[in-house]
From Swiss-Prot:
InterPro entries: PriB/PriC_sf, Primosomal_replicat_PriB/PriC. The keyword DNA-binding applies. Gene3D superfamilies: 1.20.1270.340. This is Replication restart protein PriC. The lineage of its organism: Bacteria, Pseudomonadati, Pseudomonadota, Gammaproteobacteria, Pasteurellales. Pfam families: PriC. Monomer. Component of the replication restart primosome, which is composed of PriA, PriB, PriC, DnaB and DnaT; DnaG primase associates transiently with this complex. Interacts with the C-terminus of SSB; this interaction is required to load the main replicative helicase onto substrate replication forks. Interacts with helicase DnaB alone and in the DnaB-DnaC complex, probably 1:1 binding with DnaB. The gene is priC. Belongs to the PriC family. Involved in the restart of stalled replication forks, which reloads the DnaB replicative helicase on sites other than the origin of replication. Recognizes abandoned replication forks and remodels DNA single-stranded binding protein (SSB) on ssDNA to uncover a loading site for DnaB. There are several restart pathways, the PriA-PriC pathway is a minor restart pathway. Part of the minor PriC-Rep pathway for restart of stalled replication forks, which has a different substrate specificity than PriA. Part of the major restart pathway with PriA, PriB, DnaB, DnaT and DnaG primase. Keywords: DNA replication, DNA-binding, Primosome.
Amino acid sequence: MTVQQLIQRLDQKVQQLYQAHLSKREEKIFAKFDRTLFSENGQNVSFYLKEINQTLDRIKTLESNDSNHYNFLAERLLAQCSVLSEALVRKNTHLTESQTTTKQTIQKSQHSIHKLPPRERLEKYYEAREQLNNLYRQHKDLAQAEKNNDEKIRYAQLAEVYKKRQQKCQDAIDLLEEYLVFKEEVENRENTENK
């Protein structure tokens, strides 16, 4: 298959996706997407269709003799299309659930970490900090490697968001560590006084 044929097939796929979900453009999607596919979660359908179109445009404007570049972007585009379609199908089949129940479940899972004992919570914070560090480095590297200015800016902005979140996580770790040291000192003092 030539590059031109590949682009035509991908263009058809994107057009089919647009036609299938044209009426749902303003619907919000609450699925969590892989950050390598979409830049944000919780956006409306038109946002994701726009990002799919940006990937298609990148393929159309790509000037490379290496077929791996085209394959990589084509696979990304197809993955974007399929996860968006799956999310829309899932959303439409689960419309019978009440939204308040869903919101309560999300809120409970977000706050469940705060109900853990301090030492277990600290472990979760360490894991989160490590993940945020990795995401920061990954997006910083992507920003440096990216040729397209818009994409470079987007990756740099995402890297900054991860850096700020990492700093908040570090602040929470510091505070929790201080608390645990303080608690240990108080317990040691009480133990020596009781002897």
